[in-house]
Amino acid sequence: MVLEAKGLWEEAAALYDRILAATPAHEGAHKRKVAALRGQGKLEAAATALTTYLATWQADLEGWAELAELNIALGQHRQAAFCIEELLLAVPSASMWHTWYASVLATIGDADALRTAQKHYAAAIELSEGDDVRALFGAVAVAAALAKSGASSSVVVDGEDGDSVADLPGLAAERLVQLYTQKAPGQLVPLVKAALQALRPSK
């Protein structure tokens, strides 16, 4: 780590390679090698090294999150989605990972990905008790994208009375206005309303 602190990334990576040649199961050397490669801007090599590491240390959630970030930076969103799926399998109650997964799927953008994104935005909204602003905006945006593409939505959420409510984007938009009214009143609320109106699919 002294070499890394001095910005000597290539020397650091070479050192970790020597350590791993002698001790392939050295967990710390694997992780520091990834950091050294990232420090050099070698994102593809860092992703490859991290993939090799995760083949052995599959329970390292921090590693899966980092690999997802690397894949996003490389424009490899389907690979990033796979990494986030590993996080969701480990901790399905983490609303932030549902939101992240949905955002990556929304970036992929085909109809199947958008429908799945909508389901995970709905899960994030439920798990966060309606306080995940990113998921709320995402639910509205994905519904608009589905409507624009002519694809149907498949998400149904439960209303307070126990009946099924299909208008997830409508509920999300209402909650967003409520949150901004409570926490950021003033000129921001009309801007939020205008943004939501622009996103809502025309009927």
Put a short name on every predicted segment.
Residues 1-2, 35-37, 70, 104-107, ...:
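Residue-level signature for tetratricopeptide repeat
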Residues 6, 40, 74, 108-111, ...:
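Structural motif corresponding to the intra-repeat A-B loop/turn of tetratricopeptide repeats
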Residues 18-19, 52-54, 86-87, 123-124:
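Canonical positions in the second alpha-helix
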Residues 32-33, 66, 100, 138:
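Canonical tetratricopeptide repeat
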Residues 94-203:
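Eukaryotic alpha-helical solenoid repeat scaffolds
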